Amino acid sequence: IQMTDFKQKLRGFFSDSSLFRRIYIIDLFFTNIAFLQIPAYVLLVFLFIWGVCLSVYNQRHNNTFFKLRFGIWIGAFLAVTVFTMLINFSQTFLYSLLMLLHVVMCFFLFYGMHTEPEFDYRIELYHIAKFIMYATTVMNIIGITCLMFGFKFEWYWIKFTVYENRFTGCYDNPNLLGFISVVSIFCCHILSKGHFMRRIAEKIPEPGISKIWIVACLATNAFSLILCDSNASL
């Protein structure tokens, strides 16, 4: 009986599209952190395999493709992509096939999440926004503190705190820092909206987010955004 329960829990874990989306986005975030880039990309390989299998599972159980909004245009896009790959067959065919599978996965699991029964985007948005707020605040505090004490170094691809007189902090390059800072500020805006948080409180029995964290996130990300001098963030 215990083995059966374990298999059911394992099946429930790997068939949870919502959980997959949260883990996938969080892992994509870690690919931008210089010190965590390699393990994050390694994990991304396993997440890709999980995502492709989950897309097949959702199609079999939820009939995802035929419930997609504008599904006929998505199908046409994928068909043209396959046709183009075949008529331009080359040494990069395997790479193109992997990219095609990734596109299919994104269509089914991200764009197609509206086809899932009892789906509520607010819960996922809340968890992802909260993670980004906490993670970027901690990363920015580390980076800004090291910058203030003049601690910086270069090692292979890592340009810690400063790269070409631009602030990088813990990230891979200043442009990524700028982009993530903008996303973090937007996440703070979401988490500070009263009606959104009230809807979340109705479904998740956990304490709200401290305003200290929101203010710290806004302040450190605004400061980092200025120091990174990133045109891409505009």
Placement of each model-derived feature along the sequence:
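Membrane-interface helix-boundary motifs at transmembrane edges
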Residues: 56-68, 115-128, 196-208
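Alpha-helical transmembrane segments of multi-pass inner-membrane proteins
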Residues: 126-156, 172-234
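Short aromatic-rich membrane-water interface segments that cap or initiate transmembrane helices
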Residues: 162-174
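Membrane-interfacial loop-to-transmembrane alpha-helix junctions, especially the N-terminal start
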Residues: 14-24, 61-77, 124-132, 209-214
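Juxtamembrane "helix-exit" motif on the non-cytosolic side of transmembrane helices
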Residues: 82-92, 149-152
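Aromatic-anchored transmembrane helix interface
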Residues: 70-79, 91-115, 127, 131
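Hydrophobic core segments of transmembrane alpha-helices in multi-pass, intramembrane catalytic enzymes
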Residues: 41-51, 96-110, 175-191, 232-234
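N-terminal signal-anchor transmembrane segment
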Residues: 1-59, 79-88
